[in-house]
Amino acid sequence: MALEQALQAARRGDLDVLRSLHAAGLLGPSLRDSLDALPVHHAARSGKLHCLRYLVEEVALPAVSRARNGATPAHDAAATGYLSCLQWLLTQGGCRVQEKDNSGATVLHLAARFGHPDVVKWLLYQGGANSAITTDTGALPIHYAAAKGDLPSLKLLVGHYPEGVNAQTNNGATPLYLACQEGHLEVTKYLVQECSADPHLRAQDGMTPLHAAAQMGHNPVLVWLVSFADVSFSEQDHDGATAMHFAASRGHTKVLSWLLLHGAEISQDLWGGTPLHDAAENGELECCQILAVNGAGLDVRDHDGYTAADLAEFNGHTHCSRYLRTVQTLSLEHRVLSRDQSMDLEAKQLDSGMSSPNTTMSVQPMTFDLGSPTSTFSNYDSCSSSHSSSKGQRSNRGIPGARAADLQSYMDMLNPEKSLPRGKLGKPSPPPPPPPPPPSFPPPPPPTGTQPPPPPPGYPAPNPPVGLHLNNIYMQTKNKLRHVEVDSLKEPKVELNDQFAQPSSGDGHSGLHRQDSGLLRQDSELLHRQELLRHSTGLRRQDSDRKQRSFSKQPSTGDYYRQLGRSPGEPLAARPGMAHSEEAALLPGNHVHNGCSADSKASRELPPPPPPPPLPEALSSPPPAPPLPIEGAGAACGQRRSSSSTGKVRVLRHRKSTKSFNMMSPTGDNSELLAEIKAGKSLKPTPQSKGLTTVFSGSGQPASQPESPQPLVSPAPSRTRSPTPPASGSQPLLNGSVVPAPPATPAPGVHLDVEALIPTLDEQGRPIPEWKRQVMVRKLQQKMQEEEEQRRKEEEEEARLASLPAWRRDILRKKLEEEREQKRKEEERQKLEEIQRAKEQSEKLRTLGYDEAKLAPWQRQVILKKGEIPK
């Protein structure tokens, strides 16, 4: 009780309570909170100078006492920005400006770390601070200021120690690298333009600032670096990964689209993986779509022999594997229509962009590694992106036979090939069990006055329902990983001002192993293996040395500084808005995998588990893609079902926006999509072959008829067309006569009797004059010729554009679309003028007293020209 009162009084500045507690003899050096902080620490971090002086001068509490992490009250005052308390502690309290906490951080590091330029200025020019001192991880105060985005503090530090502009931490991170990683565009500009920071310096794993910006989804920073810093798209890290690999692996669609639009090449890394492999492996469906329609090889295999679809299926991303196998048989021009229509909402992933204003946030759970530069400065001793190689890091230590047998039996249970019934594997199913014998007692007589009951069935009663087949358990288990997360993991970006530097106590291994996507399912059949699952969360493919390109971070132990603004009695994990590492910091030394803490020592004792089930043999030569789901056919629509321009289909976009994403270009050009919607029987893009035959009446108004359904045999997915509407009540009338449904536009070289399409009788059964039928025939022939000519031009245009790169083809196609739009507007304007002119002519005829319905066309023209009919 006294502890809570003392801490609250120190934080509120309640000097009377402190005096009463001191009078009662309750204030002493042993009065510490859960992190070994004295009331002196709380007064300093709250800026209550009068309480601080009272506790030090009258109560005689030591002003140089240290908390559990080695922080003095001066460290607390610097971290919270209370300059007056810091000045008193350094000048009269006995604290020294160069004192370090357990991580090697001084008060200057903390002031820069938390963005207090006034404190930084006083320490540099009056407090005697040394800006060249590094922490245990090699971080200078300038690194902290760059990562924080504090430009005023950064300018002060650069002016005081200009040699730190290109200084690297123990893992090779420079201030520019950290600024790009955190998305601070103004800091990036300042470092490159005014401080001549080198944008080509690499971290220990070979990553450059361009890679860091692409990995975190900071599109403005990436665009500026490419435009003004003379960096190349093709720069590779030590594993051969480019910026496109990092953007695709994290689902940054805007970054990926910009790279493709500006000429970045789709290349392979040292493990044979393309950006499509990384996107599929991490379940980033929209990135897979962007890469597929921009020419990424769907059948490219990495050095382990896996295609992108294989990796997606292996990691449980069925929506990605289904899409990739569907579009594998399609040409590049038709992949835009091959969206996965059957994907459920829960399978959608949110765009995993970070703090960039042009990107969105991700809720994809991730693990955290102590060696990642994307963590905090506590982790700068092994700045490796998760993308570095894991070759040679497999443990060969043995485990007891019983545990190995348990692990093998568990993997066998997850193997659908071993757990499926024989009938599922293509072998003959065993015969059904014989029906049970009839009962030995006679049935009761039926009640009188009712009909006799029906005879008993001749088949056995159904078996009671059993649990899911093990193959279903396997898939559900794999898919469960993305949902096993604590609330704090929903914020993937751990802000640097929510954690602080501590020396990493991990095993020095950075990066995320390729993990089985769901070993955390709490199922009734898996509960007895819970202990085994806790130690096998980090399973990875035995036959693969290529790491999943998704950086990981482990929480640091710097929870002391993160709780400076917390109330004394408030639990650390209960504070709203707390970062992930704050919640996990109460368990120092434990690695957190997918939201569950695991014993690091026990996990290190376990060797890698047996290999996961092999891929089915059929995957080496994928079968033809199945047809896409059939949408309900409309009664008067003969076109193909639109995949993005209509609102009837599910939106594939698994990001925050509800707008359909155009797969060919980030600029929203839908020309190929519209062309395919209007295509005829073949899959070639023939925008004017609409599958419709237009018949003109005598007044020039068109009447459209849907085409008759034609059987379509193609290995590629096809969309079902609407059937021909019934003749009763739904077909249009032409001069009063029912028009038969004409066939589709004939293929080139096929003769079509146009005259047979024109009716001979009107709606009252009277014959149509021959001259009127001939006029209708000529108009129909002219229209068909125009359509055929337009179709030919469109085919030639598409053939010419197909040989161009995707980004240039997109620009030209957009330009052509703008020209078509201008032409369409001009035609609409002319049509409106013709309608207006016809109205004026009709009004003139009525004014002259003529009945327009009784005039022949030549008489009408003469009257309008001369004002009367010649005698």
Curated annotation (Swiss-Prot):
It comes from Mus musculus (Mouse). One of its GO terms (cellular component) is stereocilium. Monomer. Binds F-actin in a Ca(2+)-resistant fashion. Interacts (via N-terminus) with BAIAP2 (via SH3-domain). Interacts with PFN2. Interacts with MYO3A (via C-terminus). Interacts with MYO3B (via C-terminus). SUPFAM superfamilies: Ankyrin repeat. This is Espin. Signal peptide: none annotated. The modification Phosphoserine is found at residues 338, 342, 517, 524, 556, 665, 704, 708, 714. GO terms for molecular function: actin filament binding; SH3 domain binding. Residues 349-400, 416-469, 493-750, 819-850 are annotated as: Disordered. The gene is Espn. Its main location: cytoplasm. GO terms for biological process: actin filament bundle assembly; actin filament network formation; locomotory behavior; negative regulation of cytoskeleton organization; parallel actin filament bundle assembly; positive regulation of filopodium assembly; sensory perception of sound. Residues 377-395 have a biased composition (Low complexity).
